[in-house]
Amino acid sequence: MKSVEDLTAYFDKVFFQKASRFEFLEIDDGHSLVKLSPEEQDLRPGNTISGPVMFEIADCAFYAAILFKDPDPMSVTVNWSMNFFKRPSVSDLFAKATILKFGQKLVVGEVTIYSETAKNSVAQAMMTYARPIKK
């Protein structure tokens, strides 16, 4: 997926149940930027965005960055760690994914999550995906 339009069309087709939640803002070699506008069901007590929603946008952003480098859709998550720094306010969330290593078998990277109103990031995810074995 070499453009925001290609990526949007792919997600609309393959992940049609959730694709409309995400707006792809940028995609290039090893990076992506994704926006999510939270809805009522994304909130938890205390009027903040829930952790699972932050996992969701991070996963989407990192998968998009991988698809730019390798359009094979069969890459899967094998490891994930997430640090929550600050409760995000109820505003748009942004996830900036960066691939740190793109190997033959594994892709390692990080995703920084920030909200529209926060000066600094609200969370960081470190993740590893396994790439499909080419025969």
What are these regions (language model features)?
Residues M1-K135:
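Terminal targeting signals and extreme-terminal segments of soluble enzymes
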